[in-house]
Amino acid sequence: GCGHWGPNHLRVFNELDRSSVLWCADLNASRLAKVQSRFPGLRTTTDYRSLLADDAVEAVVIATPTATHAAIAREALQAGKHVLVEKPLCTTSVEAQELALLAGAVGRVLMVGHVFLFNGGIIKLRELVVAGQLGRIHYLDAVRTNLGPVRGDVNALYDLGTHDLSIFNYLLGSTPTAVSAQGSCISQGAIEDVCFATVQYPDGTLAHLHVSWLNPRKVRTLTVVGSLKMAHWDDVDPQDTLRIYDKGLDEPPYYNSFGEFQCLLRSADVHLPAIRRMEPLLKQAETFVGWVLDGSPEGADAMDGWIVVRTLEAAIQSMRNGGAMTPIRVDTPAKVRTAAVPLITGQRLPSESPSGL
């Protein structure tokens, strides 16, 4: 696919020394002509099966509408190709689990494009959480809004919320247990343009997200509140992307007055940790190639993608039930993980390097 996001994948894979882009498929011939003019020598087709039949192609990137992900990924894996599929992995958890099992059976990499796992600020924040510098995490609050682009195939939660759900799981190193969600269909009859969701984790941590296509401001923020410190990430701010606040509440057994309570609020320095500046999409592409060629698994695998899709399903169910807290059933992770063991071997089909994408 070379619509809104596909050309960016073309660019980053072309920039890598260890990969070369051979084909691009899209149903729109004018889009193909445009990318071909930008990348001379690129072969194009309106039938993706043509590139799947090419033995020189070792891996494919799927950046098509979400509803098509499962079918195309299935055919690619069956053709012996490694696969990087844009988020979300697919529309249903049944499809996601089937893809995970298939990837394991054929011994091919199936990576999901949860690109914010390669964001320098999120990576640094994860390091701080794992090191215990924020203390016990009480809650997370994410906002992801903009004015458009409005999609007609999935709602704002599937489109935008997928990012935040993957970030929550990455930072907490945990699988959510329940979700409550509500949304509003404003510009289209049955597709939510704005969604609010609260996700519960096993240790009691709460994670809240607000996503919208109908907002005057582009906002990409995440606040993490811990027992020791608090963090605020703002992906739109190029200077102060990540701030660590030495603020909190020193809790004695009790307090006698409001004045005494105010004294318990602790406010100290604000720290701006050094962040490695890199393009997340380029790093994701580099990681995918490394996984294929070297057997170095990083990023979001099929199981990670499946958990996010299962959470999305539960959130939609909650919306249909007035926002009721809905269990997130992830009752077969061991089966999927076991079957997907070959994913980390980095096996390759016989062909010449560099990798053909």
Predicted segments with their positions:
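Conserved SAM-binding strand-loop segment of SAM-dependent methyltransferases
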Residues: 41-50
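N-terminal Rossmann-like dinucleotide-binding module
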Residues: 1-39, 355
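Basic phosphate/pyrophosphate-binding loop/patch that engages nucleotide-derived ligands
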Residues: 101-109, 123-137, 202, 226-230
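Hydrophobic residues in well-ordered beta-strands that form the structural core
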Residues: 46, 85, 110-112, 141, ...
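Rossmann-like dinucleotide-binding domain that binds NAD(P)(H)
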Residues: 147-217, 223, 237, 303
